[in-house]
């Protein structure tokens, strides 16, 4: 079915600034909006906004209030640090709500796609919430946090889940509910990557992401560990700065960050990937059919859950940040790695939500 698109509707795309994952998985959506004659406006804050400004220099961008998401120095205190920051987060969400209301009028916005930004919503225009976490893992408070999240999702016109609703899926309990009370659309895994047949240049690709201070802790640890790696290494620190830097030390080539095109090329040129087990990274690796090793962010239950799930399925091994040594990479040989998936998203059907006449 092909939709007759109304002339150039404006869609606000607003990813959460929590590491780079939410921003990067919005890239294929923003491109699809442009290809389907919509006008996207990007709204976020911090490194997520910086990354999307580099990716789409000609698209209008707006800065939203920061949620003040900080990681505890010790992973065990992660949940309590979040609880301590809750008042700041709630204030930011309320400010965001007010701001979105005025942005809709000022920019003539016709629809919303919010990737986990809880204040980006309007009852007056079609509003989509995108998340892979219908259940929010927080240890012994998982039931409570999941119910709160589902309550928020319920008010949106539709909820897009970047996974399949098949028996074989990537998110497991994170992205699947036992009840059918939310207006869910499983859109399939989202990735900006394409698999290419290119000669292998690197034996190991290290790619870091995620909020501070845990990104820095892992960065420092792995810079020491890769000195003992026998082979060529490319090391992407995941620090988005004004200009890209490249430094070669021994067998390791360091970059502060890469844009999508460079990342795609480097992924394809690398034999093995060492990274966090964030869901956006999982989708990219699955799209490319890569072999990988995971180090979940300490205290982030979602990443720990995904790492355990994928190891149990004999796809990807993992180690904790404290325990990891470079010798652990030898375990990868006995794991299957990701089978490459092809996901042809039906953008016509997805974007029809913005075309429904009231």
Language-model regions, residue ranges each:
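Conserved nucleotide-sugar phosphate-binding/catalytic loop shared by glycosyltransferases and other
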Residues: 7-10, 17, 35-36, 40-86, ...
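Conserved nucleotide-sugar donor-binding subdomain of glycosyltransferases
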Residues: 77-119
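Leloir-type glycosyltransferase catalytic cores
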Residues: 84-88, 315-358
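A short, glycine/small-residue-rich beta-strand->loop->alpha-helix junction that serves as a flexible
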Residues: 15-27, 213-216
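Donor-nucleotide binding loops and adjacent catalytic segments primarily
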Residues: 30, 188-272, 282, 304, ...
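A nucleotide-sugar donor-handling region in carbohydrate enzymes
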Residues: 131, 136-213, 237-241
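Catalytic binding pocket for nucleotide-activated donors in carbohydrate/polymer assembly enzymes
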Residues: 281-282, 286-328
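Short amphipathic alpha-helix
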Residues: 23-33, 48
């Amino acid at each position: 079915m092909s939709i007759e698109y109304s002339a150039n509707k404006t869609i606000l795309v607003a990813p959460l600034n929590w590491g780079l994952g939410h921003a990067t998985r919005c890239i294929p959506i923003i491109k699809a909006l442009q290809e389907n004659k919509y006008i996207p406006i990007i709204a976020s804050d911090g490194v997520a906004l910086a990354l999307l400004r580099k990716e789409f220099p000609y698209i209008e961008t707006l800065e939203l209030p920061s949620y003040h998401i900080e990681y505890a120095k010790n992973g065990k205190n992660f949940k309590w640090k979040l609880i301590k920051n809750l008042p700041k987060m709630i204030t930011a969400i309320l400010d965001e709500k007010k701001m979105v209301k005025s942005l809709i009028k000022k920019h003539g916005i016709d629809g919303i796609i919010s990737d986990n930004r809880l204040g980006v919503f309007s009852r007056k225009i079609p509003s989509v919430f995108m998340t892979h976490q219908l259940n929010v893992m927080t240890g012994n408070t998982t039931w409570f946090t999941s119910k709160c999240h589902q309550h928020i999702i319920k008010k949106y016109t539709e909820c897009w889940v970047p996974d399949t609703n098949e028996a074989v899926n990537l998110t497991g309990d994170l992205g699947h509910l036992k009840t059918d009370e939310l207006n869910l659309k499983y859109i399939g895994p989202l990735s900006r990557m394409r698999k290419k047949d290119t000669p292998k240049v690197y034996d190991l690709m290290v790619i870091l992401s995620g909020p501070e201070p845990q990104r820095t802790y892992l960065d420092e640890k792995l810079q020491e560990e890769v000195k003992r790696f026998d082979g060529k290494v490319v090391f992407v620190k995941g620090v988005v700065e004004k200009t890209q830097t490249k430094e070669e030390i021994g067998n390791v080539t360091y970059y502060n960050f890469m844009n999508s095109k460079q990342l795609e090329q480097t992924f394809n040129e690398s034999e093995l990937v060492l990274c966090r087990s964030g869901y956006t990274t999982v989708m990219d690796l699955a799209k490319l059919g890569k072999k990988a090793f995971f180090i979940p962010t300490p205290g982030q239950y979602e990443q720990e859950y995904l790492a355990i799930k994928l190891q149990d399925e004999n796809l990807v091994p993992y180690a904790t940040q404290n325990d990891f040594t470079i010798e652990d990479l030898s375990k990868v040989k006995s794991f299957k790695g990701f089978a490459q998936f092809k996901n042809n998203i039906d953008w016509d059907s997805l974007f029809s939500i913005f075309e429904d006449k009231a």
